[in-house]
Amino acid sequence: LYSRVDCWQGDEISFKYKNKNIVKKIKTRKSMRKFLLLGIILSAATLLSAQTKEDVIYNPIITGVPSLSISPDAVGGAMGDVGVASKPTLASQFWNSSKYAMMDSKGGLTLSYTPWLRKIVNDVDLVYLAGYYNISEQFGTLSASLRYFSLGNITLRDYNGTELGNAKPYEMSFDLGYSRRLAEYFSMGVALRFVASELNAKTEGYYTGIGFAADVNGYYSRPIEVSSGTSRLGLGFNISNIGSKISYNKGVSSNFMPTNLGIGASYLFPFDAYNRIALNVDLNKLMVPSRRSKYATGFNQSDPATWAMSDKQYSEISVVKGIFTSFSDAPGGFSEELKEISVSTGLEYAYNEQFFVRAGYHGEHIEKGNRQFFSAGAGFKWTAFTLDVGYLIGVSQNNPLDQTLRFTLSFDMDGLKDLMD
């Protein structure tokens, strides 16, 4: 619906959206902060730090339903957004659902809440509910999750400042997963996802965006005996959100899902019977075609047609073709492809598997979104229940992700059973 963010300069922001022959321009000040967020969420699919450098040409990859890429839980979020190969948690449905098959408990449930972008707005929230049940080693493990991302209440205005009403846009998804241990140290999983994106913009000709997607993932976890106990090496991959495009106007135009390739490695090392640390590293790359435009690296001002790609041409790229070409279609060549890879590193210290302290860093190239932040967090486990908290610290001065908090409450079925006995 919102085809382009035209301007981002402090509080004064304007952008255009098109509806067939209708072109409206929305421009205001205070209330436009939410419109900025909506424009980014729906069209840019990435949250840019408010840095203005004349020598930087921003070329983020555009997707629909970008909230699917927001890490929902306080454990992975406190470690720089890692989770592809880290120790399995109850929120593994988002990171790598095949990890559920490696969990010792019969099942569990987790609820996470994130007041998102509190530095900009006060009513944007992400709620995430996930759980799993281990049927048996022979029949595998079932898992599910529900995600709801609310963009709060937004006042719609035309470019004259006249109010057009209020909107309450949201994005949500529901998915079911199955995972199974295929070997002593290796498991695989799949998840099927239903996605709905409601703009609530009260514009004729636009509807709720509906889409379907799937995840395919694997996890390798091998114990290694060391002098202080048993360490563990973890390796994993997750190809997430492989699926249909999403459209708000019944196919007239459509956006790619945020299909993502994530690979990770982890190493858990025990100092003694009570103390251990875990080191985690994830690499992520969107498997979505780059869009060549005058804003892209390498644009030749004297020959705009060289890099220009019309909306129609881009929308005609199939999902399968887009996945494979996403590794070689960046306008800036191989060097720009490398810029599309984000890096997450995380460290976790645990005492007696009851007290946890976490820290991490997430880095994304400035041309591809500039989401750069440090993170920290802590957790406490008491029998069946675990409470985790995560906190983000933006690298840049005006990073909208700065001061973001995450809260996660989890309970374990085996622990709950022991508590009842």
Q: Which residue stretches match the model-derived regions?
A:
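Cleavable N-terminal export/targeting peptides
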Residues: 1-63, 415-421
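Subset of outer-membrane beta-barrel
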Residues: 51-421
